[in-house]
Structure formats: structure tokens, C-alpha cells
């Protein structure tokens, strides 16, 4: 029992502090019904909730520059002003904005990049304007959008928005044309988990036979379904081809223009070092062999040159060849002089007196 009381007391003590912290983080500023034509610049930059409703603000370029000063805004209310168009990057610096209400203006044009930068936006109210058509790509930056209100405009056809977190969609009060052009939205409403607000009031205005039907339950003709299927097939093929072409183009562009990263630079350095080292080793091994081949080639060329020179000399001086031949023959001729007379013995043998004299001397 004491523990329970202590827990209640602790909770009661912490609750006021939590409320005070929340009140400290929220800084509201109410400038509604001030007859302003421009967004004031003297507001604290810490403002988180800004109400500028029921003025004469047009949200021109000057207003967009002033809005950039209030980057901490989480809620912005611009109802019942004189805004006729939303231009590209009108809210580009409001990175924390979660609620944007621009109902009750005269907006007829919404450029494709109007909501760039509103990545945290969760609720968007564009009701009671003069919007005729919307590019579905306009909502692409709104990845966290949960509530979209397009009530009371002049929209006749509308493609299914690519909003992954959308929960509530309000479309009543528009002159919907329930022909084949609206079949995609019709199928999307019946297959997605999005809740169509005021479904029984979101009625077809054309054709006459469908005026009492909701756009979600209207019976579309068989021709519309067949046309829709063929359109999906064509879109898929074109998307696949364009994706392949764009990917190949991006790959080519990247390979040609994208700077190499550190890993590529390191890899190139390693390869260059290995190639240079291999080249040096190859040169060190092959240099002696190449030197011997070059030396033998030079020696061979030298011998050929001497032989050619010798032959050329002989060809030019044939007389010298005869002289050299005569000289060589004289030098190599050996003339023996007969010092002793040979005596023919009775037995038919020739006696050499030189031998006999030597024998006599030996006997003596």
C-alpha cells in the first residue's frame, strides 16, 4: 500500500515538470486578423507555432525569405489569405514543420517543387481553394505525410499519390469526372489502407448516370478496365526501358566523370608498384644475357668487317697478292746442298760417306 502511494506521489510530482517542459518547447505566436500583407520579420526565431490566418498575405518571394528565419516551426497556419500560387521551394528551410494549413485561399497553381524540404510534414490542408489539377510528383518529398485534405477545390481528375504513410484523404467537394481517367484513383482507394474521409459525400459529377455514386464505389465500364490494364502494361515497359537506359547512362557517366575513391587509388598504387618491381627484377635477370648477346653480336660483326676489308683489299690490289704468293713460296722453299758424294756399292746400295765417317770416329 505504501509503495502504491509512493508511486502515485512520484507520478504527480513528475507530471507538472513534463507539462512545463512541453510548454517551454512550444513557442506559439498568433498574428491572425492583423491585416498583414507580408509575413512579419520581428518574430522570435524560436517560434514553433505561427498563426497568420485572416490576413492579406500573398506568400511571395519576400515572404518565403522571411519564413526561412523560423526554422524551428512545427505548425504554420495561413488560412484565409490572398495566396494564389505556391512556388518552388516556398517552405524549403522549414525542416521541422509538421502541420501546414493553407485552406481558404485562391490557390490555382501548385508548382512541382512547392513542398521541397518538408520531409517531416504530417498534415497538409489545401481545402477551399481553386486547384484544377495536381501533379502527383508534387507530393513526392512528403515521405511522412499522414493527412491530406483537398476538399472544396475544382479537381476533376487525380492520380493516386505516392505517399507511403498516408492514412486519411479528404476529396469531397470536387467535381469528379468518373470516366476512365479516374479508374486508377478508384482502384487505389479500394486496394490501399487509406481512409477516404466523407466517402458518402465524395460523389461523381460526371457522367449523369453516376452522379449519385461515390468515386470509390462507382461502377466503371469494362472498356475502362481493359484500357487501364493495357496502359499499365505500356507504362511498365516504358518505365523498364527508361530505367535501363538511365542506369546505363549513369554507369557510363560515373565511369567517365566520377573521381576515383581512396580504395581505387590504393589499388592502382599497389598494381603500379607490383608492375614496376616485376619490371626491375626482369631487367636485372636479363641484362647479363642481353650483354653477352650484344657482345657476341659485335664480335661477329667485327670479324665480318675484317673479312670484308681483306677481300676488298685483295680485289683492289691483285699484284700484291702475287707478290705475297711469291714471297711465301720463297720463304717456304728449303734448298739442301750435297756435302758428300753418294757411292754406289757393288750390291746396288748407295753408301753414305757421312755415315761412314761418323762410324769411324766412334770406333776411334
From Swiss-Prot:
GO molecular function terms attached to this record: signaling receptor activity
Signal peptide coordinates: 1-20
Phenotype upon gene inactivation: Knockout mice display increased longevity compared with the cohoused wild-type littermates. Almost all mutant mice remain alive, whereas most of the wild-type mice (>80%) di after 2 years on standard chow. Mutant body weights are lower than those of wild-type. Gut tissues of wild-type mice show slight inflammation whereas mutant mouse gut tissues do not. The gut tissues of mutant mice are more yellow and the colon tissues are thinner in mutant mice than in WT mice and the ceca are enlarged significantly.
Assigned keywords, A-Z: Glycoprotein, Leucine-rich repeat, Membrane, Repeat, Signal, Transmembrane, Transmembrane helix
UniProt-listed InterPro entries: Cys-rich_flank_reg_C (IPR000483), Leu-rich_rpt (IPR001611), Leu-rich_rpt_typical-subtyp (IPR003591), LRR_dom_sf (IPR032675)
Activity regulation text: Activated by TLR ligands such as LPS, bacterial DNA and peptidoglycan.
Keyword flag Signal: yes
Pfam family for this entry, one: LRR_8
Mapped LRR repeat ranges: 44-69, 70-93, 94-117, 118-141, 143-163, 164-190
Domain LRRCT: 174-225
Subcellular location: Membrane
Function: Pathogen-recognition receptor which mediates the activation of TRAF2- and TRAF6 NF-kappa-B signaling pathways and induces the expression of pro-inflammatory cytokines. In kidney, prevents infection by uropathogenic bacteria by inducing the production of cytokines, chemokines and antimicrobial substances. In gut, involved in host-microbiota interactions, plays a critical role in promoting the recruitment of immune cells and intestinal inflammation.
The protein's assembly and partners: Interacts with TRAF2 and TRAF6.
The protein, known as: Leucine-rich repeat-containing protein 19
Organism: Mus musculus (Mouse)
